[in-house]
């Protein structure tokens, strides 16, 4: 595993070394086709790329989103416990997908059809216990309480926000975000959306409201523009100044 440039290396002030690279250009199209099929067939329940922070970070972020613990078996990936840090924190290309037990064999078969069966592993299961539990050779080697992980995950942003924004609202947001009973928004559309909407005569105008420190507004605008909207970039300061667009 190549650790050059990884988050782990950076926080330890270690520079140099070999960084990950794309070595699987020939397999990439097949991989994308399999993922697309699984998505189309609604077999994928959750998906996360292995990127900043490596495997352990991707798993933690999936737990944060679902508010569920994980029981992870490292036997398929780990030959010796001395390789544990490199395994968990390397940022080589990879993804984690969640599927139902009944869809596991089909998932393996699809990856086998493109020659990637040996690169796909069953890592474990979700758990109602609020813990990330990593096991190797039937021994518990890491046990991380989800609540403490979630607090640590948000801590740096919280400390910055306290200085930048209203500390009272920053504290409220921090407590909200780190509450494991908070399952996020679950929007329900109570009406049927027509498959075809006639917006050729005029483009509906919408404003995408953003605050300092946010990102993703350009991608959101591109998506709305693609389906016929006229998007306006609207900042919180525009509201404060009562600017008319």
Tell where the protein language model's regions lie, with residue ranges.
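Catalytic core of tubulin tyrosine ligase-like
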Residues: 97
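Conserved beta-strand elements of the Class I
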Residues: 205-207, 232
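Short N-terminal binding/cap micro-motifs at the start of the first secondary-structure element
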Residues: 215-217
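Intein/HINT protein-splicing elements and their conserved insertion hotspots or analogous self-processing inserts
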Residues: 1-89, 100-205, 213, 222
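Flexible gly/pro-rich beta->alpha loop and the following alpha-helix that scaffold active-site loops
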Residues: 223-227, 231-245
């Amino acid at each position: 595993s190549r650790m050059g440039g990884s988050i782990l290396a950076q926080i330890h002030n270690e520079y140099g070394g070999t960084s990950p690279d794309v070595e699987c250009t020939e397999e990439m199209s097949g991989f994308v086709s399999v993922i697309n099929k699984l998505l189309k067939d609604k077999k994928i329940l959750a998906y996360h790329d292995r990127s900043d922070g490596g495997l352990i970070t991707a798993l933690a972020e999936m737990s944060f989103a679902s508010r569920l613990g994980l029981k992870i078996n490292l036997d398929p990936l780990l030959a010796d416990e001395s390789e544990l840090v490199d395994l968990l924190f390397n940022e080589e290309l990879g993804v984690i997908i969640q599927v139902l037990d009944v869809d596991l064999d089909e998932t393996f078969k699809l990856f086998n059809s493109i020659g990637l069966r040996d690169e796909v592993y069953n890592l474990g299961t979700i758990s109602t216990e609020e813990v990330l539990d990593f096991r190797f050779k039937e021994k518990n080697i890491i046990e991380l309480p989800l609540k403490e992980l979630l607090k640590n995950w948000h801590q740096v942003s919280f400390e910055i926000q306290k200085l930048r924004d209203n500390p009272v609202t920053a504290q409220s947001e921090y407590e909200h975000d780190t509450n494991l009973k908070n399952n996020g928004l679950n929007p329900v559309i109570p009406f049927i959306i027509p498959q075809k909407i006639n917006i050729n005569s005029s483009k509906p105008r919408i404003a995408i409201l953003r605050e300092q420190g946010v990102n993703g507004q350009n991608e959101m605008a591109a998506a709305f523009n693609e389906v016929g909207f006229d998007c306006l970039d609207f900042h919180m300061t525009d509201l404060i100044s009562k600017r008319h667009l």
